[in-house]
């Protein structure tokens, strides 16, 4: 904070630290502003809407400014140096009154309009003429927020689904839409209500109505025919049905099927495959989309992918790329032999499996296709139109699919030098007819690798054949379903296993880096406030053979079923990431480095946004598991012994959590640089030496204190339901290193 006497009169400070004259009080003010965004879908009778915020970016954050604000007599100084904060996500508990929200503190940034406007929408206008987002009316260095998420709307049996992007310039625009200043000591609240994608549609249709330049995205509209699906980053498929009458009508009009592909931030033209193919691919990779016809069965259920045919093998003549398949339909429009299906409404049809490759590029650095890179997508339609800037597409699609990116918490700036691992996004097991559904898995991995889950998967495959794995009560088969029989020989061999079940050590990495990954990819995507013993829990399978259950709702808790309660019912499969390589058979680098001689651990391969890099020393304030207080220090030293050594004294769990126990008061010669670890730091200490933290406590409390209190370790990570059960224990102190 900063402050000054507004009158300019002399201020006398007494030896007691008080101001001699009450008329000349120094009034302090915050040098930053507080900005809050709430985002929700509009409610309307007869329409079902949902919006889920994926990430938010804060652009043009001022890097410098005055200590004292722009008071009378001071010249207005506009920020020249700015930077960006990209790819932020919100937590599972960041919901109030049904709306998602986030709050940030931003430095003052005073900026002047470029051109006057008369509406909120015009503030975000970029005239749609630039390949990059360059605003026409807003100042070039004005602070703005980019909201990215998924919108879905159902009305009268027709569903629209959109990956949308909203741009919101900050400033008090309620009093003046030309106002872009972010002033210190002010609170700004922006309530965003997503009421539809119509403005995006207007852009795409190029109608003479006012478009909404602050909103962009891909808009799909599908109704009685066809479907749109979101698929995960592993190997996927979707069965599509094509009607003979449709291609015959297109052919009469001198056209064929339209398609468009989005990948790696670029997209093809809207390509028409008829007598000739029109439209450019623009160097966009389309090889990840393939078709096969034999024994495919389409499902009318819009949430069901259908029954795929067997993958014929990458070198099989039965496999088509996009253009050759659509050309095949065009060329055989009148050939009744291929249109083997029939229904009474639409006539003859052909069912084909669209095989989607894993979202992995062996010819690129892995940072080029993970996390918040634009998702890749594929659309097949009779009619497609795009906005003039190419940023929005409106398609009355017959079929459309969007594929998630692999999510990782590893430092993407080191993609050229380290092998990482990433995870899928969707919990495929929820609501699916796996044998583990309801009862959970009784299966323990046959592997004994505590780090590399793929090594354990290979041991499991060695023990059981594929047929037995499909029928037993395990989640191994769930991970096998993420892989593909690439050579078409009828089995998934060792060199075809790309996706595997994590070890506990790998789950800990995902927990440490939760903030880095998308909102949808978080292992626990519900609220902890409603947790009960049996409800709202999300239990994941681990390939660590003595800890096969990971409790995602508790952040870091484990057990071993069936020797303990709670069988795992979900699994979040992993994929190893290595630049310019297929990478699947490389062991991922550990995300931490431990110096044995110095007893120091450094999270040197974790994205720094997941870490506490401040280097601040001393005890932590009270905090919960998903708050900033539970970010682990990037580097810290682990004490050689615990206190008290005999689990006696005042180190109860409650006293540690609420700060009555302090490391500097009891340990290491009163050095105030030592402190109690938070929960994530204690998880890292488990990776180094589990025995060191046996019956040890941490500073972090659980966000639902009525459900669980805090954490400890007794052969597995566990949580207390009552303080009295943990009246004595110990603490392994740490010292943060800069």
At which residue positions do the language-model features occur?
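Tryptophan-paired
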Residues: 1, 10-29, 34-184, 308-311, ...
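Short beta-strand elements
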Residues: 1-19, 161-189, 386-432
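Intrinsically disordered, low-complexity repeat and linker tracts
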Residues: 182-232, 574, 581-596
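Surface-exposed binding patches on compact interaction domains or structured appendages
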Residues: 231-349
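Active-site microenvironments of metalloenzymes and redox enzymes
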Residues: 383-484, 576-670
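An exposed tryptophan-centered "aromatic clamp" motif
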Residues: 476-485, 494-498, 504-576, 657-675, ...
């Amino acid at each position: 904070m900063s402050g000054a006497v507004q009158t300019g009169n002399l201020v006398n400070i007494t030896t007691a630290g008080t101001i001699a004259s009450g008329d000349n009080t120094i009034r302090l003010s915050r040098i930053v502003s507080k900005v809050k965004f709430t985002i929700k879908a509009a409610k309307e009778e007869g329409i079902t809407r949902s919006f889920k915020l994926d990430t938010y970016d804060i652009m043009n954050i001022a890097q410098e400014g005055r200590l004292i604000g722009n008071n009378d007599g001071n010249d207005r100084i506009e920020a020249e140096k700015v930077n960006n904060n990209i790819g932020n996500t919100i937590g599972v508990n960041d919901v109030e009154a049904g709306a998602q929200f986030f709050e940030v503190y931003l430095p003052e940034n005073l900026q002047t309009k470029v051109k006057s406007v008369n509406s909120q929408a015009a503030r975000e206008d970029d005239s749609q003429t630039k390949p990059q987002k360059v605003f026409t009316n807003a100042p070039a260095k004005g602070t703005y927020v980019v909201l990215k998420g998924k919108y879905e709307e159902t009305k009268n049996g027709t569903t629209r689904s959109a990956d949308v992007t909203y741009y919101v310039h900050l400033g008090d625009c309620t009093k003046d839409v030309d106002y872009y200043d972010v002033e210190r000591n002010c609170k700004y609240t922006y309530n965003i209500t997503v009421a539809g994608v119509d403005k995006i549609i207007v852009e795409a249709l190029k109608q003479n109505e006012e478009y909404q330049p602050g909103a962009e995205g891909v808009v799909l509209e599908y109704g009685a025919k066809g479907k749109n699906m979101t698929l995960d980053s592993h190997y996927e498929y979707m069965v599509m049905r094509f009607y003979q009458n449709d291609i015959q009508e297109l052919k009469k009009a001198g056209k064929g099927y339209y398609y468009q592909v989005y990948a790696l931030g670029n997209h093809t033209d809207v390509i028409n495959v008829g007598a000739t193919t029109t439209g450019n691919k623009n160097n966009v990779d389309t090889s990840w989309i393939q078709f096969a016809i034999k024994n495919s069965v389409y499902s009318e259920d819009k949430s069901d992918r259908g029954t795929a045919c067997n993958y014929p093998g990458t070198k099989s003549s039965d496999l088509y790329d996009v253009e050759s398949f659509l050309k095949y339909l065009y060329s055989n429009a009148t050939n009744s032999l291929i249109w083997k299906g029939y229904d009474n409404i639409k006539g003859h049809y052909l069912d084909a499996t669209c095989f989607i490759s894993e979202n992995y590029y062996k010819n690129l650095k892995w940072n080029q296709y993970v996390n918040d890179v634009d998702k890749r997508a594929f659309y097949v339609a009779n009619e497609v139109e795009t906005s003039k800037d190419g940023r929005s597409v409106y398609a009355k699609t017959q079929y459309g699919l969007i594929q998630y990116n692999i999510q990782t918490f590893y430092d993407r700036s080191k993609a050229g030098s380290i092998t990482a691992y990433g995870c899928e996004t969707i919990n495929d097991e929820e609501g699916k007819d796996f044998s583990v559904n309801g009862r959970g898995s009784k299966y323990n991995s046959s592997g004994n690798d505590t780090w590399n889950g793929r090594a354990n998967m290979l041991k499991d495959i060695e023990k059981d054949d594929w047929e037995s794995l499909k029928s037993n009560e395990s989640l191994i088969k769930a991970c096998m379903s993420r892989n593909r029989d690439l050579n078409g020989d009828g089995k998934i061999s060792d060199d075809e296993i790309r996706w595997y079940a994590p070890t506990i050590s790998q789950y800990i990495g995902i927990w440490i880096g939760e903030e880095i990954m998308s909102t949808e990819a978080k292992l626990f995507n519900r609220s902890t406030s409603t947790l009960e013993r049996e409800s709202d829990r999300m239990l994941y399978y681990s390939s660590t053979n003595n800890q096969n259950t990971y409790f995602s709702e508790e952040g870091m808790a484990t057990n071993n079923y069936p020797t303990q309660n709670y069988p795992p019912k979900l699994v979040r499969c992993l994929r190893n990431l290595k630049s310019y390589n297929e990478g699947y058979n490389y062991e991922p680098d550990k995300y931490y480095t431990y110096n044995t001689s110095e007893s120091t651990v450094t999270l040197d391969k974790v994205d720094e946004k997941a870490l506490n890099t401040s280097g601040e020393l001393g005890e932590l304030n009270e905090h919960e598991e998903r708050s900033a207080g539970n970010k682990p220090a990037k580097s810290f030293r682990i004490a050689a012994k615990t206190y008290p050594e005999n689990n006696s004294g005042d180190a109860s769990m409650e006293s540690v959590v609420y700060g009555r126990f302090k490391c500097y008061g009891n340990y290491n010669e009163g050095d105030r640089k030592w402190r109690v670890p938070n929960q994530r730091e204690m998880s890292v200490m488990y990776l180094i030496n589990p025995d060191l933290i046996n019956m040890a406590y941490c500073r972090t409390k659980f966000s639902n204190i009525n459900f669980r209190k805090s954490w400890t370790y007794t052969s597995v990570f566990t949580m207390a339901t009552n303080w009295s059960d943990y009246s004595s224990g110990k603490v392994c102190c740490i010292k943060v290193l800069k």
